Amino acid sequence: MDTVKIDTRDVNFWYGDFHALKGISMQIEEKSVVAFIGPSGCGKSTFLRLFNRMNDLIPATRLEGEIRIDGHNIYAKGVEVDELRKNVGMVFQRPNPFPKSIFENVAYGLRVNGVKDNAFIRQRVEETLKGAALWDEVKDKLKESAYALSGGQQQRLCIARAMAVSPSVLLMDEPASALDPISTAKVEELIHELKKDYTIVIVTHNMQQAARVSDKTAFFYLGEMVEYDDTKKIFTNPEKEATQNYITGRFG
């Protein structure tokens, strides 16, 4: 029996009066990769950001329903949002390194969380840069600015930065859309490696990418989750006509 990592129950979400997500229930298994696909404005990124409460930062939003991670309701009273975001890391569409050295970009989260043991920090920086398949490219220039890295290297640095505080879930919002094909391939290879240790949820407009990297795929349209199934089934034999129309390019 696969362990359920993320469990959402009848999730509805509003921006002001706009009903952005409508009755979404799904389960995401531990150490799997789930892709969210669908046209722009369908709600997939909004849903992703609920998993580490990023939408809390937007005024006049409202959530109904439950989102549980490891069995705990992450919107219950008393939940420490900082602790949640340590456990549920986020990688954004455009690489966003801090104006610091490569080393300090990765060490930042550890320092913010009160880690003062420099030997541990050095070890963790090396471990996560290796985990993000970046160590061999940067090990001799850790003191240089992160801005000196290529876009693809910066994105892998941001993945390492998210990994440094030992999350169990990684959220990726279009992580390769701003990258060239070679850098995109490296990020996709990395996702395959990371699922040994992490539960990964990725939003992508690139359906070929969803087909390559994910175990399951959810298709969103107009704020609803139309279909959620094994990726192979979604792309070869979907049950819903809307899913078929989207993956064959008839709309979107």
Swiss-Prot record:
Location of this chain's protein in the cell: Cell inner membrane
Domain ABC transporter: 6-247
UniProt EC number: 7.3.2.1
InterPro entries cross-referenced by the UniProt entry: AAA+_ATPase, ABC_transporter-like_ATP-bd, ABC_transporter-like_CS, P-loop_NTPase, PstB-like
Membrane topology reported for the UniProt record: Peripheral membrane protein
Major place of residence: membrane
Signal peptide coordinates: none
UniProt superkingdom: Bacteria
Residues reported in the UniProt entry to bind ATP: G38, P39, S40, G41, C42, G43, K44, S45
UniProt GO molecular function: ATP binding; ATP hydrolysis activity; ATPase-coupled phosphate ion transmembrane transporter activity
Key words of the record: ATP-binding, Cell inner membrane, Cell membrane, Membrane, Nucleotide-binding, Phosphate transport, Translocase, Transport
Enzymatic reactions: phosphate(out) + ATP + H2O = ADP + 2 phosphate(in) + H(+)
Function in brief: Part of the ABC transporter complex PstSACB involved in phosphate import. Responsible for energy coupling to the transport system.
Family to which the UniProt record says this protein belongs: Belongs to the ABC transporter superfamily. Phosphate importer (TC 3.A.1.7) family.
Record text on subunit structure and interactions: The complex is composed of two ATP-binding proteins (PstB), two transmembrane proteins (PstC and PstA) and a solute-binding protein (PstS).
GO cellular component: plasma membrane
Gene Ontology biological-process annotations: phosphate ion transmembrane transport
Protein name from the UniProt record: Phosphate import ATP-binding protein PstB
